[in-house]
C-alpha cells in the first residue's frame, strides 16, 4: 500500500586543484573527525553558510590559526536566546495553557517573516538592522564590509548566530575572500599568490539538494517503468510535496516546494502526515489498492506555486542559492504562509485522485 523511503543527500565538496596531494586531515563538517584534535593546529575552513557558522566560533577557541575561506558573505541575524527563570520553568511544567501560549508566540513570530519574503521591498528595513548587527559585532570596518553580503537579505538562507561575527575579532582568525588557486601538500595558495600553511582542511560547504542529482543513487519506478529521477529531469514537482503523478502509492514528506525559509518544518510534516493518513483511509474504504494524484491537478498546482514564487525575495533578490536548481527554478520552498498549507491539506478532496485496483492499472480502466 505505501512505499516509505529516505533519501540521504550527498555532502557537497568543492573541487580544488591539488587536493589529492594534501597530506593533512580533510573532512566534511557532517562527517566530523571527532578523534582528531584541532588543538594547536592551523586549520582552513571552506564555506560560510549554515554549517560553517555553527562550528567556526567553537573551533576558533582551540586552533592555533583559523583561515575562513569565504566565497559569498551570508546574512546573519541575532539569535533570540535567553535563560528561562525558575518561575517560567515551573509554569511550563504545570500549565498546558502556558506552553500553548509560548508555542503560539513562537509560531506567529516566525510566520510574520513571510511578509518581507513575498514583498522584498519591505526586507530593506530588516536588512538595515542586519547591517547594524555586523557593524556592532565586528571591530574592523574593512572586515565588516567583507562580511556584508551584496544581495538582498533573504535571497539566500538567513542565518542565526550571536557568536559568528565576534569570532573574526580574534587574532588567530583570518577571513580569506580570495579564491583558492591550488592546494599543496601542506598549504593553500590563493589566486593572489599568497600561501598559507595548514594542518587540516574542513569543508563546511553544505549538501547536494537538487533531487535530480541525489536521485542518481536511488531507484523509484512508477507507471510505465518511468523512474522518479527521469520524471523530475526538468525539475522536481509534486502535489503539496506529498504525491507525484504517475507514481501511485508513493507518499512523500517534505517533498518539492514544501521546505521553509521562515518557520518550523515540523508544522509542515505534521500536516503532511495527517493528509497521507486520510489518503490511505480513502483507499481502504474504496476497496481499491492504489491511489494517484490526477496529472492535471498536479500541473495546475505547480503552475500556481511557481507563479507565486516569482515575486519573492528568493527569486528576485539578486543571488543564486540551494533553493534553486541550476536553471533557476525554485523546487524547494513553500511560497506563502504555513497556516495556508495546513488549511489546504486539512482535508483530502477525493475528486483530485484516481483510485485504482493495482498500481499498474491504466487511467482508462
Give the residues covered by each predicted segment.
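Short hydrophobic core segments
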Residues: 1-8, 43-46, 66, 180, ...
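A conserved short coil-to-beta-strand element within the FAD-binding core of flavoproteins
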Residues: 32-35, 171-191
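C-terminal active-site-capping segments
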Residues: 267-270, 274-365
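Short beta-strand to alpha-helix junction loop
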Residues: 117-126, 152-163
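Rossmann-like dinucleotide-binding core of oxidoreductases
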Residues: 7-141, 173-174, 196, 227, ...
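Active-site proximal loops enriched in glycine and acidic residues that flank catalytic Cys/His/Asp
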Residues: 70, 177-179, 200, 205-206, ...
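Central helical "cap/lid" subdomain
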Residues: 13-26, 189-241
Amino acid at each position: 500500500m505505501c512505499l516509505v523511503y529516505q533519501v540521504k543527500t550527498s555532502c557537497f565538496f568543492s573541487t580544488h586543484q591539488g587536493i589529492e596531494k594534501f597530506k593533512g586531515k580533510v573532512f566534511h563538517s557532517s562527517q566530523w573527525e571527532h578523534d582528531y584534535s584541532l588543538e594547536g593546529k592551523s586549520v582552513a575552513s571552506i564555506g560560510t553558510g549554515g554549517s560553517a557558522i555553527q562550528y567556526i566560533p567553537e573551533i576558533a577557541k582551540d586552533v592555533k590559526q583559523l583561515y575562513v575561506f569565504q566565497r559569498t558573505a551570508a546574512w546573519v541575524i541575532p539569535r533570540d536566546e535567553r535563560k528561562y527563570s525558575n518561575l517560567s520553568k515551573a509554569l511550563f511544567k504545570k500549565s498546558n495553557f502556558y506552553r500553548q501560549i509560548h508555542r503560539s508566540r513562537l509560531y506567529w513570530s516566525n510566520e510574520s517573516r513571510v511578509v518581507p519574503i513575498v514583498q522584498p521591498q519591505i526586507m530593506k528595513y530588516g536588512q538595515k538592522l542586519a547591517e547594524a548587527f555586523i557593524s556592532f559585532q565586528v571591530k574592523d570596518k574593512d572586515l565588516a564590509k567583507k562580511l556584508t553580503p551584496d544581495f538582498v537579505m533573504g535571497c539566500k538562507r538567513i542565518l542565526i548566530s550571536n557568536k559568528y561575527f565576534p569570532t573574526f575579532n580574534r587574532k588567530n582568525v583570518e577571513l580569506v575572500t580570495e579564491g583558492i588557486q591550488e592546494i599543496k601538500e601542506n598549504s593553500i595558495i590563493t589566486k593572489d599568490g599568497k600561501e598559507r600553511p595548514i594542518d587540516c582542511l574542513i569543508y563546511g560547504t553544505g549538501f547536494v539538494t537538487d533531487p535530480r542529482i541525489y536521485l542518481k543513487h536511488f531507484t523509484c519506478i512508477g507507471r510505465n517503468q518511468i523512474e522518479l529521477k527521469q520524471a523530475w529531469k526538468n525539475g522536481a514537482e509534486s502535489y503539496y510535496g506529498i504525491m507525484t503523478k504517475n507514481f501511485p502509492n508513493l507518499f512523500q514528506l517534505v517533498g518539492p516546494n514544501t521546505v521553509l525559509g521562515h518557520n518550523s518544518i515540523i508544522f509542515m510534516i505534521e500536516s503532511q502526515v495527517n493528509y497521507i493518513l486520510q489518503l490511505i483511509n480513502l483507499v481502504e474504504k474504496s476497496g481499491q489498492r492504489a491511489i494517484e494524484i490526477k496529472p492535471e491537478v498536479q500541473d495546475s498546482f505547480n503552475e500556481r506555486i511557481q507563479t507565486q514564487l516569482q515575486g519573492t525575495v528568493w527569486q528576485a533578490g539578486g543571488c543564486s542559492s540551494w533553493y534553486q536548481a541550476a536553471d533557476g527554478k525554485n523546487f524547494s520552498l513553500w511560497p506563502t504562509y504555513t497556516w495556508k498549507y495546513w488549511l489546504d491539506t486539512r482535508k483530502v478532496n477525493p475528486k483530485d485522485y484516481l483510485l485504482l485496483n493495482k498500481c499498474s492499472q491504466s487511467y482508462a480502466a
